[in-house]
Amino acid sequence: LFGQEGITPLAKADIGVVLGGEGIPTCLTAPQVGKVMAGIYPNWDAAAYADWCRRFDLPENKKYGDYSTGMKMKQCLAVALSHHPKLLLLDEATSGLDPVVRDELIDLLLDFVRDENHAILISSHIVSDLEKLCDTIAFLHKGKLLLCEDKDTLREEYALWHGTAGQLEELDKNAIVSRRVTAYGAEALVKRELVPAGSTLTPVSIEELFVLMVKGENVR
């Protein structure tokens, strides 16, 4: 990690962690949180923390336990960003936020990774957020890793095929990742390069890809 073998104390100091708004004592105010963190992180930047608190409109006299979900997330991010991490670990960081706050958070994270020395590892059930933020996406379902691939490669390699149930049976089985037949027709998640020219294909979003992998009939 960061060119070092193992996770050393110095490496830990370069990691910012946000665990779904958890991890901060509910009895503390924002200034009190800053004082606690200053004793934990060797590279804590009090000025940066004060600036993040201002940017996030965190009240000085309100306890963390009285914050809304969005305010809790902002408090956790203020902490995570104020010791100048190289890596942010985010667990369901956008879940439960209203659309405006979530959009603000995504913009902030995109700004963070514009620095080539920064990276984000995020877990989320909000796939649209992953599409905006991530270069590489891994899909876990029931403890199994179904895929781990570059986002652009996923879009280029896979597509949605549309047709009748009869036409579906004529497709090369190696082309079909999963399929779904309804009273209105058939659709399949396919590998573009293995379907015949002239087939009716539409681009597949990452969310559609995940849903078809889980809910569609797997032909493997």
Question: What is the predicted role of each segment?
Answer:
Residues 88-92, 167-171, 194-198:
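Short, surface-exposed beta-strand/loop "edge" segments at domain boundaries and coil↔beta transitions
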Residues 29, 150, 202-205:
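Short loop/turn segments at beta->alpha junctions
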Residues 105-190:
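ABC transporter nucleotide-binding domain
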Residues 9, 47-51, 152, 166, ...:
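Generic alpha-helical secondary structure signal
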Residues 1-128, 132-141:
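ABC transporter nucleotide-binding domains
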Residues 178-220:
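C-terminal coupling/interaction segments
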